Design a protein with these regions (language model features):
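Glycine-/small-residue-enriched transmembrane alpha-helix faces in small-molecule transporters
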Residues: 1-54, 59, 66, 89-96, ...
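C-terminal-most transmembrane helix of multi-pass membrane proteins
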Residues: 4, 56, 156-157, 242-244, ...
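Hydrophobic alpha-helical transmembrane segments of multi-pass integral membrane proteins
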Residues: 21-26, 50-69, 142-149, 181-188, ...
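Hydrophobic/small/kink-forming positions within alpha-helical transmembrane segments
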Residues: 32-35, 57, 91, 95-99, ...
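Specific transmembrane alpha-helical segments of multi-pass solute transporters/efflux pumps
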Residues: 33, 72-111, 116-117, 153, ...
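Specific alpha-helical transmembrane segments that line the substrate/conduction pathway
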Residues: 50-61, 102-135, 140, 144, ...
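Hydrophobic transmembrane alpha-helices of multi-pass small-molecule transport proteins
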Residues: 63, 67, 127, 136-159, ...
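Helix-helix packing/entry segments at the starts of transmembrane helices
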Residues: 113-119, 199-221, 254-290
Length: 319
């Protein structure tokens, strides 16, 4: 990981060089980009798998142009069979992440969904000890517990009647069953995103940005198309309004957001980028409250639970 350029020391204050500012500007733009994901998905009337497929398809058009212009596709010649297998696995997990998380937004609030899906750093910290032989410390387990408590509060906030109604809701009865289903799908989205990150991290160590996202986004696109065919989800034709939403998801959350953060990882410490990702629930919740088509204001319990999830995730991700 490269370091930022050294700034000469002088007695008078001087502006930060543009070369140093650029990664932070990209990171700020990326945060804005990913914050639009949940509100745009909520505004779409298409099936969750269809949204994911078109989002990836539009993204791949731009990725393909970047690969052809920059010649990054040549890096694929050096890939081993295990690399291709890993890329396919990461792509499938990304497809499952989009499917489960997109679906969660049909059942639960934007605030609850984005808070729960951002448990992924906690999940990574918890399973790293078993898979990567990087056991979590006692302090990390404490903050993992805090995040889990926050997730439980978010779930209870979605159930009218609180703890007494949780049993019937889990059995599919009562008004809270739909919200709990959405919360569960958001948690599955966090698990699949954590797996996508852990598997893809190995590929990113020896693959440049565009070859990496080209492989993984391509595998995810194929997986989404196959899932659409298997579930008979209508891929086409789509009305202009939906196509505009799909293009917005590709340009904002996908390319500006996720790809911008992948670029920033080469210029900034990983923990800085990870902390920025955890700003998504704040941005998404504000947008969901302000956009006329959604106008969704979270309740106090959701805010408290979400704050615990984010605090636990931030501190559990640090060693």
């Amino acid at each position: 990981m490269s370091s930022s350029p050294t700034v000469p020391v002088s007695n008078s204050p001087s502006p930060i060089p543009s070369a140093t500012r650029t990664p932070y500007l990209v990171l700020a733009a990326s945060l804005i980009g990913i914050s639009f994901a949940a509100p745009l998905i909520r505004l779409s009337e298409a099936a969750p798998l269809v949204i994911a497929t078109w989002r990836l398809g539009f993204s791949l058009i731009i990725v393909a142009i970047a690969l052809l212009v920059g010649g990054g596709w040549r890096d694929w010649r050096t890939l081993s069979r295990s690399d291709v297998f890993l890329a396919g696995g990461a792509g499938v997990l990304l497809a499952l992440h989009f499917w489960t998380w997109n679906t969660s937004l049909r059942y639960t609030s934007v605030a609850a969904s984005v808070a729960l899906v951002n448990l992924q750093p906690v999940i990574i910290a918890a399973i790293s000890g078993f898979w990567l032989r990087e056991p979590a410390t006692g302090r990390q387990w404490f903050w993992i517990t805090v995040a889990v408590v926050g997730a439980l509060i978010v779930g209870l906030a979605d159930v009218p009647g609180g703890i007494r109604a949780i049993g019937p809701a889990l059995l599919g009865a009562g008004e809270g069953s739909r919200a709990l289903l959405g919360d569960g799908l958001a948690l599955l989205g966090a698990v699949t995103a954590a797996g996508y990150y852990l598997i893809g991290r190995r590929l990113r160590q020896h693959l440049a940005l565009w070859p990496y996202v080209g492989l993984v986004y391509g595998a995810a696109f194929v997986a989404c198309v196959l899932l659409c065919l298997a579930t008979q989800a209508p891929l086409a034709p789509q009305p202009p309004r939906e196509l505009a939403i799909f293009a917005g998801l590709a340009l904002g959350p996908m390319l500006l957001g996720h790809t911008g953060m992948n670029w920033a990882l080469a210029h900034l410490p990983a923990f800085v980028v990870n902390l920025t990702v955890l700003g998504e629930p704040v941005g998404a919740t504000l947008l969901a409250a302000l956009l006329p088509g959604i106008a969704e204001v979270p309740g106090p319990a959701t805010i408290v639970g979400g704050a615990l999830v984010l605090t636990g995730a931030i501190l559990a991700a640090r060693r």
